[in-house]
């Protein structure tokens, strides 16, 4: 949207997976804008079969053209941005089944190594699985996630919440108790609702 003219540009196709026969909403993108006005598009991959991609607009505040910045294994991208710190990226990898990870970047091009956030298995379970929703409020990152019993997506249960005020260096519960990541225990201190 151009605030000066009051005009809305026509949509722009950044990446069309349909040309490869992909018609899967798992591949939907997430959009972020940085402090300089560049538009960033994080296109989800699917499992380990299709890699995710990051694109950046060639010019600030302009959807005319994009460049691909990187391609790697990731799904369900959730990208946060701080003008002071840069990008913080929550995402899923299928190293096992739907495990949660995060990484950060000051410029969107050079990223820290990804770190695992959660992979909960209980008792005799051999696989984990999670879905999450995340947000940023001021300098606080927060994510809430469930767990899938033995990795079965149809057994979504319980709610866990962790937060960080130092850009993912340390994590705590909502009441400030330290949380060790990756969260691997069913009864971890960040469990807020137990539905099992």
At which residue positions do the language-model features occur?
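Extracellular, repeat-based ectodomains that mediate carbohydrate processing or recognition
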Residues: 1-196
């Amino acid at each position: 949207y151009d605030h000066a003219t009051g005009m809305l540009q026509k949509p722009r196709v950044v990446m069309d997976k349909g040309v490869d026969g992909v018609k899967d909403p798992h591949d939907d993108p997430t959009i972020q804008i940085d402090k300089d006005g560049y538009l960033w598009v994080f296109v989800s991959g699917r499992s380990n079969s299709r890699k995710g991609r990051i694109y950046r607009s060639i010019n600030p505040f302009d959807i005319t053209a994009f460049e691909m910045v990187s391609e790697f294994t990731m799904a369900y991208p959730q990208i946060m941005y701080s003008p002071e710190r840069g990008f913080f990226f929550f995402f899923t990898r299928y190293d096992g089944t739907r495990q949660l990870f995060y990484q950060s970047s000051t410029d969107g091009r050079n990223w820290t190594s990804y770190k695992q956030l959660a992979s909960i298995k209980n008792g005799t379970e051999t696989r984990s699985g999670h879905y999450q929703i995340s947000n940023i409020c001021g300098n606080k990152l927060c994510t809430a996630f469930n767990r899938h019993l033995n990795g079965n997506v149809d057994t979504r249960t319980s709610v866990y919440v962790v937060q960080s005020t130092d850009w993912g260096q340390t994590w705590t519960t909502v009441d400030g108790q330290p949380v060790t990541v990756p969260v691997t225990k069913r009864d971890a201190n960040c469990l807020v609702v137990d539905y099992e």
